[in-house]
């Protein structure tokens, strides 16, 4: 079924010690690839630290140029420190700044698993992703902020919902009615189906995971 849909991927091996990579899946019918770049996340105070790279992909979407920055920031597993995610945030911010320096109206979408919530300093301060749509030129808009504020998320831990999976947009995609693509207010959402949620047992109401530790349990 997927083969007939004509999907393609952008993938570059990352330095991550667990072998986890980031990738972009896209339909060739709608998106024409122009450039691909891998940006390593380097902690200068801990050069032995290895994590996922940032995948920077630019292409044409319906005659408009758009850049995707694909993220999978350092994990919280085993008490993973927020300083590592701040390093990732600063790295992503430097990529954004370099794009905006060339074109202040550049259309940029940062997406992926940030392993932090919208209010956490890595996102709100270091990446400068804000909830308000009244943005200065360099700020980004976090389309998922209000969703998390309402108590929704994509990860349940000890009964509390976290929203690590986020979509963050540059000003070039906000309220630009003269362009074909712009963000429509409150259009961001979390895909929800009953079969994605545990219906019984200890984790009733939490997402049905693919793995429990190293054991595959058949979820998503």
Segments from the language model and where they lie:
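Soluble non-cytosolic domains of exported or imported proteins
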Residues: 1, 16, 48-49, 79-90, ...
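Structured beta-strand-rich core segments of catalytic domains in phosphoester-bond hydrolases
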Residues: 2-65, 73
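Extracytoplasmic/secreted envelope proteins and their assembly/folding machinery
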Residues: 22, 86-89, 93-96, 123-124, ...
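Secondary-structure boundary elements
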Residues: 30-32, 59-67, 94-106
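Metal-dependent phosphoester-hydrolase catalytic domains
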Residues: 49, 98-107, 116-220
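Metal-dependent phosphoester/phosphodiester hydrolase catalytic core
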Residues: 62-94
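Active-site metal-binding loops of divalent metal-dependent hydrolases
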Residues: 73, 113-114
């Amino acid at each position: 079924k997927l083969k007939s849909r004509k999907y393609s991927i952008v993938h570059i091996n990352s330095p991550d010690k667990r072998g986890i990579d980031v990738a972009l899946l896209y339909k060739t019918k709608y998106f024409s690839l122009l450039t691909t770049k891998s940006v390593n996340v380097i902690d200068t105070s801990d050069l032995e630290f290895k994590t996922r790279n940032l995948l920077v992909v630019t292409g044409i979407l319906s005659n408009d140029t758009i850049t995707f920055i694909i993220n999978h920031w350092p994990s919280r597993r085993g008490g993973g420190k927020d300083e590592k995610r701040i390093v990732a945030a600063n790295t992503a911010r430097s990529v954004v700044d370099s794009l905006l320096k060339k074109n202040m109206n550049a259309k940029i979408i940062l997406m992926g698993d940030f392993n932090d919530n919208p209010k956490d300093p890595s996102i709100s301060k270091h990446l400068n992703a804000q909830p308000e749509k009244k943005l200065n030129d360099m700020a980004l808009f976090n389309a998922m902020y209000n969703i998390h504020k309402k108590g929704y998320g994509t990860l349940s831990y000890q009964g509390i919902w976290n929203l690590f999976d986020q979509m963050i947009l540059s000003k070039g995609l906000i309220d630009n009615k003269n362009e074909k693509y712009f963000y429509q207010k409150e259009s961001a959402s979390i895909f929800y189906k009953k079969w994605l949620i545990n219906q019984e047992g200890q984790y009733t109401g939490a997402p049905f995971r693919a793995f429990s530790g190293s054991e595959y349990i058949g979820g998503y």
